[in-house]
Every structure is written in structure tokens, then in C-alpha cells.
Amino acid sequence: MSIQVEHPAGGYKKLFETVEELSSPLTAHVTGRIPLWLTGSLLRCGPGLFEVGSEPFYHLFDGQALLHKFDFKEGHVTYHRRFIRTDAYVRAMTEKRIVITEFGTCAFPDPCKNIFSRFFSYFRGVEVTDNALVNVYPVGEDYYACTETNFITKINPETLETIKQVDLCNYVSVNGATAHPHIENDGTVYNIGNCFGKNFSIAYNIVKIPPLQADKEDPISKSEVVVQFPCSDRFKPSYVHSFGLTPNYIVFVETPVKINLLKFLSSWSLWGANYMDCFESNETMGVWLHIADKKRKKYLNNKYRTSSFNLFHHINTYEDNEFLIVDLCCWKGFEFVYNYLYLANLRENWEEVKKNARKAPQPEVRRYVLPLNIDKADTGKNLVTLPNTTATATLRSDETIWLEPEVLFSGPRQAFEFPQINYQKSGGKPYTYAYGLGLNHFVPDRLCKLNVKTKETWVWQEPDSYPSEPIFVSHPDALEEDDGVVLSVVVSPGAGQKPAYLLILNAKDLSEVARAEVEINIPVTFHGLFKKS
């Protein structure tokens, strides 16, 4: 996909530095020519505060949520950012310490409370973070920033002001929800979260939020659970970051990375555990893939199995005759990749960064093909009859269907991650192109385009430049799937460069169209969207 480059200067460390919010937008300096049709806002979420006073956050997913916005109008660009006023942030600023436990950082006990006060706080339940640093998405006419708990935060996409916290538990039965909901073209939102099912065992609920109706009531108040997936382990749900959706099916991939709920509930308050302390890997289960009939709201008991991998991001899922095509950004093995994303590791000098990454699960882009009709299938025979794929599915004597993938891209310690597609046109449908952030030993140093049919790749890469997830924006008069541009926030600490810029690439060949430079550093961002004017 690209020549593996070295980063001895360690410029990637700028991604993990605390910054201040802005009181008003900055005007960016544009080089090149921004298409006049590109009007709207790029909204992105990520951590912006990596310590509170003398207390540091330890994990990549701990820093307090910073909401970013690049506005595009008539060829000009402005940049703005504000910290999201979550409970976690407001209380930390008020008490000048970390008050709510984050993903990999324990909250320090309140020095004003004695041991009995802290003990009795255990019986009031676990205090879950609302630190909405992962993504932002629309619901009806509103926009919400989110993490992966039951809390989402309504924000104003124009001013970046925080409006209110919303607890999803008040509307549906979920303990949390992913930061990667699917949004259909009519505005319907689908998401997944674990829940307590029958006999107090764990299950996974698919939640549907309808589009805005004529009564203008908040669509979240009309949320409903439409189907439930079983869990392979009664008390240990798998970590779920995304799922697949087509017009007729829902796909859930259950990985061996598990949350030990007994540890979560018993040791959290008393022993100072954090979220990362409660993860463990099931070394023998492999991966279970589940499907449900979306229209009939029915779980289909096809038992798809394959070897172990970590999964964070689905690229796309679609139907092809009597098969489901599931394209995934995988990490080989059962060990949790997040174990390697502590800030101490990511801030190491380059040789240490590489050394740590060599121990981690290795990335691979894979295509799995799931046969839907297995009623009359022969045991031991490959059920995949589609041309142009090497993926296989074999029915075993225990009625499980063993899947072997087709590899779409693989490079040693070279990940194609944070995938994006022309979602409005191709989400849940056959497609050709995916865009991704290239990770070099976990350091983001290139932008990539992948033809999933031919495996041809294109790359944008510059020295001492660290881009973000690419966001595809379609041309308003597009005739082809890749007619449009790709947007990415690039941190550029190298000599002679501005600290950061918004990069605009031609989506066909990743050639540069324009860039909009700012005079301040921009820390790492995870996910976001383009909101058209």
C-alpha cells in the first residue's frame, strides 16, 4: 500500500498534547482551490485534555472530549473547537481533579470523604462516564456526541455549545451503545448495546430510533428494541464497537474480547478498577457471527464461526444473491488491541513505539461471505458459490458454519483502519471503494483508498504529517461512487510547516486539491461527519 516510513523525530507525540478551546473561530489560510460546491461543516470528536492539574489520564480513550468544526463557505475555511461540557469535564474542572473513572484511568478518591463514605458509594452503583470523545451523529434535526456508555450529549453544531446529557437507559434496555450507529437515508437510526436478557443473562439489543415525525417530538423518546442477539457467555458480553446493516439483515460479530461484569460491578468502587481492568480474552471461543432478519425483526439461528480476531470497524456489509458480504478491519488473535493504546506507549520514541507494536495483534482487511440458505447444504462442502471471491463457508457436523476469509489487504504492522465509504450511496449495498487511515505501528501516517474488487490501492503521505480518519464527501452531481473529495485533519509538526491543516483530496486518486492551514496544534480526533449546509 505504501513504503513503510520511519518517524525518528517523534512528531506524532503532538497528537497527544493538551490544547485550549477557542473563544471564536479562526480563519484558515487556504492553498489550492476549495470546490465551491463544498459548503458545510466537518465535525470531529477526540480528546483535548490529557491531564487535570497534576493528575494524568493514562489511556488514549480517557482525555476529555473536544469538539472540532471546520466550516466551508465560498472557498473559505474557518476552524473552531470547544470542550464538551459533560459531567466528567465540568466536575473535573470544578474540583481540579479526575472525578469520574475513564476507560483506562481510575478516579482518585475524594480526599474529603472518609473510607466509610467511599464504601457506601459502592451501593449507589457504578458512576459511568459521559465523556463523549468518540463520535458525533444526527438524530432527527439534532446532533449528539457520544462515547460507548449509556450517555450521549446533545450539542449545537453551529456554536459547539453543549445542550444536555441524555441517558439512553431512560428509553430502552441497554447498558451502553456503540459510537457507530447506522443512519438510513430517511433518518432512521440503528444501534446495538448489551443488556440483561432472560434469567438475568446478558444479550445484545438492536435499538431503532425513528426519523423525525410530523409531531416534531424527540425521536429518541420513540426508541424501541427491534431484535435481540444471544450472548455466548451468560455474564461476559463481548466488546462491541460497530455492526453491519443491509436493507434486509443485521450482522453482529461477537469477538473473544469480553467484559467481566462481575469484576466490573464488584471491584469498581471498592478497589479502584477502571474499564480496561474489566476486559479479558476468551482464548478458545474464536469469533461468532450472528445475523437477524431486519424486516421481520427475527434472530436467525445460523451458527457462523471463525478463528479469533479483534474487531472495531465494519467497512461495509451487503447482500449478494443468497449471501451476505461482510468486510471488516480485523486484528488477528484474541488479545485486546486496546492494551497497546496507553498514552505512555504512544508517546514513546520511535524505536520503542515499533517494539511495542510488534507484540500486538496484527491488522488485516478481510471479507467474510455468509451463506443464508443452508437447509439442504452438504457437510464438509464449501457453500460459497459466488464468483470473484476466495472466501469459504463450510458446514460442519455440529451444524456450525466455519468461515475462512478473503484477505483484501494485509501488511506487517500496516493497518487500514477508521474506514469510510460513500455511505449515502453504498452503505449496506454493493460497493467498490473504501477509504482508510493508514496506521504504521499505531502511528497514523497516511491516507489510503482501496478497491475492494481488484485490491488496487492509492496513498497520500507526506513526511512528518499525521492525518485523521478520512471523510468522504460526494459531489452534488456525482455520477460515480468516488466522485467527490476526502477530508482529513493533519497534524504537521515538521520544520517549515504550519502546526495543523485540513486536507482536501480528490477522492478518485487521492491527489491534493487544497489545504486550509491553522496556526495552532490540533490533537488526535477519532470520528466525525460532514454536515452539509
Swiss-Prot record:
Effect recorded for residue 417 to A: Loss of enzymatic isomerohydrolase
Effect recorded for residue 527 to A: Loss of isomerohydrolase activity
Gene Ontology molecular functions: all-trans-retinyl-ester hydrolase, 11-cis retinol forming activity; all-trans-retinyl-palmitate hydrolase, 11-cis retinol forming activity; beta-carotene 15,15'-dioxygenase activity; cardiolipin binding; isomerase activity; metal ion binding; phosphatidylcholine binding; phosphatidylserine binding
Pfam family, one: RPE65
UniProt EC number: 3.1.1.64, 5.3.3.22
Cofactor(s) listed: Fe(2+)
Subunit structure: Interacts with MYO7A; this mediates light-dependent intracellular transport of RPE65.
Function per UniProt: Critical isomerohydrolase in the retinoid cycle involved in regeneration of 11-cis-retinal, the chromophore of rod and cone opsins. Catalyzes the cleavage and isomerization of all-trans-retinyl fatty acid esters to 11-cis-retinol which is further oxidized by 11-cis retinol dehydrogenase to 11-cis-retinal for use as visual chromophore. Essential for the production of 11-cis retinal for both rod and cone photoreceptors. Also capable of catalyzing the isomerization of lutein to meso-zeaxanthin an eye-specific carotenoid.
Record's protein name: Retinoid isomerohydrolase
Species assigned in the record: Canis lupus familiaris
Source taxonomy: Eukaryota, Metazoa, Chordata, Craniata, Vertebrata
